[in-house]
Amino acid sequence: MAKRDYYEVLGVSKTAEEREIKKAYKRLAMKYHPDRNQGDKEAEAKFKEIKAAYEVLTDAQKRAAYDQYGHAAFEQGGMGGGFNGGADFSDIFGDVFGDIFGGGRGRQRAARGADLRYNMDLTLEEAVRGVTKEIRIPTLEECDVCHGSGAKAGTQPQTCPTCHGSGQVQMRQGFFAVQQTCPHCQGRGTLIKDPCHKCHGHGRVEKSKTLSVKIPAGVDTGDRIRLAGEGEAGEHGAPAGDLYVQVQVKQHPIFEREGNNLYCEVPINFAMAALGGEIEVPTLDGRVKLKVPSETQTGKLFRMRGKGVKSVRGGSQGDLLCRVVVETPVGLSEKQKQLLKDLQESFGGPTGEKNSPRSKSFFDGVKKFFDDLTR
């Protein structure tokens, strides 16, 4: 069967720059990669065709030969035109295809251990003051029998006889030698003849471990604490991953936190709001007295400096802001109701101008609104 033109395969012109070729290759490789089209023979054939076109058109020597001789340049025996191969393709997939599907160059390194995440719930008090907590996590630990090698005690992994430890083998394609991952050792460069009886050659075993985690004062929801090397053990002696402790602060019954400031609502009765006085308000360090001036309205904020949260990164401490809520009295006796009626009369009715300036302003605005509508 005649082979399609490589430029046509990638959908680029014969004058396309390498950047355009790589872009086209990435797009098509994503579409036809076998991992995305399992069992689809047509997609697999298409992918091989795309790969072959890319290998030729991104190599200056190969591309020149292809432009001159076409596919004949790569058939066994070739055109005999002073062209004697040796191009190294070990970085083709590292530079382009590896970015998409995780391929690598040369011998594969043993994989670093996976990072782990632990969600930790804290009370507001614990988050503000700091705390040390013990946690228990399931993980993969280095095998204590083979010490991560995967080989039976007293033995060592052997150098792969196929690739001689390089993790790569060369295959001839016409004039050219193409490097591929060794199919015998899967790119590791070593083989385990006698696997460890405990980890069965993996170098890691499942375990649970207990850690003591120091939470610094001032942390908040969303903060992460990194414990280096406390993640899963790496493969065959590779470095371990890290453990990330994700902080979540529970809702507090009294305080709300915004940054390093704390907020709380303080209810007072309308007599205290009108006449003023002194009340006790809570802080994280205990109760403190707060002076309420006369004629205090709902929503007024009182700032208590330095009664908030100290920044986890050092520096100044936040404040406590107390928001006053003036409560309407309930469960009134007949006598209290009469007293309130007398008080209302003394105000000059519900919209008393002198004693309720905001009410007068509001009702004056309402009256003007309706007057304007009827004009």
Swiss-Prot record:
Residues that bind Zn(2+) 1, according to the entry? C143, C146, C196, C199
The entry's Zn(2+) 2-binding residues are: C160, C163, C182, C185
* UniProt-listed InterPro entries: DnaJ, DnaJ_C, DnaJ_domain, DnaJ_domain_CS, HSP40/DnaJ_pept-bd, HSP_DnaJ_Cys-rich_dom, HSP_DnaJ_Cys-rich_dom_sf, J_dom_sf
Q: How is the cofactor bound?
A: Binds 2 Zn(2+) ions per monomer.
According to its UniProt record, where is this protein mainly located? cytoplasm
Keyword Chaperone tagged:
yes
Gene Ontology molecular function: ATP binding; heat shock protein binding; unfolded protein binding; zinc ion binding
Named cofactor requirement(s) = Zn(2+)
Query: What are the J domain coordinates in residue numbering?
Result: 5-70
Keywords attached to this Swiss-Prot or TrEMBL record, sorted alphabetically, are: Chaperone, Cytoplasm, DNA replication, Metal-binding, Repeat, Stress response, Zinc, Zinc-finger
Listed PANTHER family: CHAPERONE PROTEIN DNAJ, DNAJ HOMOLOG 1, MITOCHONDRIAL-RELATED
Give the record's subunit note. Answer: Homodimer.
| Name of the protein described by the UniProt record | Chaperone protein DnaJ
Q: Which gene is the coding source of this polypeptide chain?
A: dnaJ
